[in-house]
Amino acid sequence: MKSGIGEATGILIVHPPTAKACEPPGGPARLAGALRARGVACRLWDANQEGQLALLGAAALQRDGEGGGGDTWTRRAVRHREENLAGLRSPELYAHPDRYCRAVRDANRLLWAAARPSGVRLSLADYEDSRLSPVRSADLLTAAAAPGANPFYPWFAGRLAEILEETPVSHVGFSLNYLSQALTAFAMIGHIRRAYPALGIVLGGGLVTSWMRSPGWQDPFAGLVDAMIAGPGEAPLLALFGKTPAAGFDRPDFDGFPLADYLSPGLVLPYSASIGCWWRRCSFCPERAEGTRYRPVPPGQAIADLCALTGELRPALIHLLDNALSPALLTALAAEPPGAPWYGFARITPELADRDFCRRLKDSGCVMLKLGLESGDGEVLKALGKGIDPALAAGVLENLAEAGIATYVYLLFGTPAETPGAALRTLEFTAAHARTIGFLNLAIFNLPAYGPETEGLDTGEFYAGDLPLYRRFAHPKGWNRGEIRRFLEREFKREPAIAAILRRDPPFFTSNHAPFLAMAAAHRSADPGRSG
């Protein structure tokens, strides 16, 4: 820590814009649980949720001030702003997918309109500056040097002053997990450094961990940021305040988040039952590349935490944040339901090939599982170290569908082992099992910036910047990004059975809102007289 800051008396933990504002962030709540359990004053600030709502309101006021000027779409979005926001917080809207999609796109239009004068393309899920890049440290420092250029600045400067007046602290910590948060986080940091020079600034989160664990890391932010944390932040923050961390895991504490105001039909409770991944054998695994050790919360404690939090907060849905839910945790959930519907990311495993086990998961409240299938070709799956084959995947999809558990399936095209023929077999597999697939995520493979699997590939810069997450590579089989995009657009997405799945995907909120649409669809199926 920088000298001269003074005694550590308390911390404000900030979740900066921009990310999906449909649930409170799990990481800061976990930090708050550890700090508060040891008597450290900790205030949580979801600047992402508050900031997006502020810009939605600012866009509406701006258009009203222009006498209703602007294009037809934006005028409609202004006119229906309150109705759309109320709808996104109501289960009824999710029973009408077309109306739901229009409400989401109208809300997104307002964010776009509010940020456009700043040269920023802002959405409900992303932030893209026409001049600055989050993968260049010089651009992040530029954002810090000129915070007034950020579209959130008029709001966050005033709101931060209010918070610091209400809750004096010695430190401000930023939880930075996504590239879409980086430029605004640094604008906020730059403002704090000038307006509140006595405050210590701490920076951590998943994105920061990736930066700091990359080979040859040299801190470009010294003098602006007082401390950067790689990996879990509980122990370093407790040490800052002279406290000793526990050997285990503390229950997350969500006090301070606006739990009734997120853009979902009821509270979505995020909970992480592990750090790292229990499998750790996939090729290009970021957990292995970054040296992240797998540390599970004991299943009994995870169930106790979930039951206690569910009893206290009454969530509409539990979001299990693990990279992959372990078989031990799934077994514990099946045996002792947490008290609310739940979903999370799971590997395709032999446990899910057991039809009775899938039914027990459904009975425990499981409404959706996200599955990283990646490919429908057996040779590609073997090369990726997935530990599965298409036959197992087909059986798992069938069992989950029979049990009434929706699936959100992730497919990855362009891995080094894939050929055009293998991609075609993925198309055939997906079409053949379309009845059992609820939603699809299609992605083109990005080669991680470092890791043992990158050796032997012809690589180059993916984008110009000193904070890269990915590298460009020449596909060893000539199956490059242009050809993959054409295949996806001209063949994969035009397959009728697949096109029907893709039309169901929630815009912007994607897998975060998919469980609500799945639950609404299941309710309609159970009650055919209900209008759709």
Q: Each PLM stretch: what is its role?
A:
Residues 12-18, 198, 210, 303-407, ...:
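Conserved SAM/AdoMet-binding glycine-rich loop
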Residues 14, 18, 22, 30, ...:
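C-terminal accessory regions of radical SAM enzymes
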Residues 50-57, 63-169, 215-222, 287-341, ...:
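Conserved Radical SAM active-site core
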Residues 263-300:
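Canonical Radical SAM [4Fe-4S] cluster-binding loop centered on the CxxxCxxC motif
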Residues 10, 18-58, 62, 128-250, ...:
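Glycine-rich beta-alpha loop elements in corrinoid/cobalamin-binding modules
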Residues 35, 277, 302, 320, ...:
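Conserved, mostly hydrophobic/aromatic
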Residues 141, 241-270:
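N-terminal [4Fe-4S]-dependent radical SAM core
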